[in-house]
Amino acid sequence: MAGLLFDVFAKSRDRGVLLHEFVIMPEHFHVLATVPEQLTVERFAQLIKGGFSFRAKRELGFTGEVWSQGYYDRRVRTDEELQSIRHYIRQNPVARDLAQRAEEYPWSSANSRFRMDDLAPEAKASFISSL
């Protein structure tokens, strides 16, 4: 399931989204992304949750609701806020005792197998969490 959700994250790059950090936890996810002007943060969240729901039902046989309604988002305004969010995302599995080190968790941008996009200084990144 986590692989399917990451595929949906990665597919958002086709729409110009830049992925900077992410973690896929057993019951929620966090993502730090820059969403292009033609795509709102709300629409990006819909694409992620809706895209995953559609594929999970089709490919994994899920029935019913996959996600809770809504999501949490926050525009990143300062470098300090950016560093705090990056740390929070990377350390989430460690805080939940799912890994001893962030790099060991298989579904996190802290793991070196994932290629993340650079964050330009002038970019307007958003932090999104969902259950």
Which sequence ranges carry the predicted segments?
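Short catalytic/metal-binding and nucleic-acid-binding patches
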Residues: M1-L131
